[in-house]
Amino acid sequence: MAPPALQAQPPGGSQLRFLLFLLLLLLLLSWPSQGDALAMPEQRPSGPESQLNADELRGRFQDLLSRLHANQSREDSNSEPSPDPAVRILSPEVRLGSHGQLLLRVNRASLSQGLPEAYRVHRALLLLTPTARPWDITRPLKRALSLRGPRAPALRLRLTPPPDLAMLPSGGTQLELRLRVAAGRGRRSAHAHPRDSCPLGPGRCCHLETVQATLEDLGWSDWVLSPRQLQLSMCVGECPHLYRSANTHAQIKARLHGLQPDKVPAPCCVPSSYTPVVLMHRTDSGVSLQTYDDLVARGCHCA
C-alpha cells in the first residue's frame, strides 16, 4: 500500500532538530553498507561486531521518541500559549441624538457571551452602513465599561462621529469587537475557567478526544516501522451558535445557518493547531524519518 499524501516538514525547536540529527547519524553508522537496508539478520556478519537489526533500531527510535515527548511536555508547561483572541459581531441600537451626536445602546452581556471572565475588549469598530469606513470607538466603549457603580444591563454611549462619517444610521449597523485575555491574567484564568461553556451540556460541543490506533488500524503496517501505536487527538462534537468561532466567516456562517439551514451548513469542529509526529518508515532505498505537522490535532475550533 502506498503511503498517504501527507506533507512532511522538519519540526521546529533546536532540541528536536539536534535529537533527530543524532538518530540519523546512528542510522548512517549502524546500517549495512551494501544490499537491502531491510535485509534479514542471517545475511549480516555474526558476532559482537554485527550490525543493528530492525528490532534494535526500533527500540532506539522508541527511546528517542519518548525523550522527544518529554521535552515537548516540558516546553508546553513552561511556555503555555495564551488563549486565542475572540471576535464578536453585534447589532447595536443606534439613533440620531441632538447636535449631530449618535446614541448607541449595546447589551452588556453580549460583549463576551460564552467567553471566560479574563477576556477584555481590545478594539471596537462601528460600521454605520455596510459600505462605510469602520469607526474606531474603542476608547469611549472602554471608558463606559470602566465606570464604577451599578452595572446596568445595557451600555449607552453618546458619540460624535467624524465629518466623513456624518450620516444617518441604517438598519445594517454593526459593532465588531475584538477581545483578548487581559495581561497578567491569562494563565491563571485559563486554568480557573474553561475556555468556553458548552450550551448543549458537558462533552457535546467541539473538543479534543484522544483515540489509540495501531498501524494495522490505519493500514500503515506495510510501510511504517515505528511507532507501532499512535495516540491520535481528534476534533469531535457539535458547533452551536458562536461557539469557538474560528473567525468572522465562521460567525457569519453560523448566523446564516440559523436563518437558512437548507442552504448554509453549520460550522464544523476542525483542528486549530497540530502536534508534530515523527514516523520511521520504509523507502525504496532503506529507512527514512519524516515529521508530519498536520496529523495529530492539538486544539479545535468551529469553522
UniProtKB/Swiss-Prot annotation:
Disulfide bonds: C198-C205, C206-C269, C235-C300, C239-C302
Chain positions carrying an annotated carbohydrate: N71
Function per UniProt: Hormone produced in response to various stresses to confer information about those stresses to the brain, and trigger an aversive response, characterized by nausea and/or loss of appetite. The aversive response is both required to reduce continuing exposure to those stresses at the time of exposure and to promote avoidance behavior in the future. Acts by binding to its receptor, GFRAL, activating GFRAL-expressing neurons localized in the area postrema and nucleus tractus solitarius of the brainstem.
Pfam families membership: TGF_beta (PF00019)
Additional information: Gdf15 treatment is efficient to reduce obesity and promote weight loss in mouse. Administration of Gdf15 reduces the adiposity and corrects the metabolic dysfunction of mice with diet-induced obesity. The combined administration of Gdf15 and leptin (Lep) leads to significantly greater weight and adiposity loss than either treatment alone, indicating potentiation between Gdf15 and Lep.
Prosegment residue ranges: 31-188
UniProt subunit comment: Homodimer; disulfide-linked. Interacts with GFRAL and RET; ligand of GFRAL, which mediates GDF15 internalization and cellular signaling through interaction with RET via the formation of a 2:2:2 ternary complex composed of GDF15, GFRAL and RET.
CC annotations in GO: cytoplasm; extracellular region; extracellular space; Golgi apparatus; nucleus
Keyword RNA-binding attributed: no
Organism, scientific name: Mus musculus
Stated name of the protein: Growth/differentiation factor 15
Family affiliation: Belongs to the TGF-beta family.
GO biological process terms held by the UniProt record: cellular response to chemical stress; energy homeostasis; GDF15-GFRAL signaling pathway; negative regulation of appetite; negative regulation of growth hormone receptor signaling pathway; negative regulation of leukocyte migration; negative regulation of multicellular organism growth; negative regulation of SMAD protein signal transduction
InterPro entries tied to this protein: Cystine-knot_cytokine (IPR029034), TGF-b_C (IPR001839), TGF-beta-rel (IPR015615)
Primary gene name: Gdf15
Keyword Transcription (UniProt): no
Disruption phenotype: Mutants weight more, have increases adiposity associated with increased spontaneous food intake and exhibit reduced basal energy expenditure and physical activity. Female mutants exhibit some additional alterations in reduced basal energy expenditure and physical activity. Mutants mice on high fat diet develop obesity compared to wild-type mice. Mice also show progressive postnatal loss of spinal, facial and trigeminal motoneurons. At behavioral level, they exhibit a task-dependent increase in locomotion and exploration and reduced anxiety-related behaviors across tests.
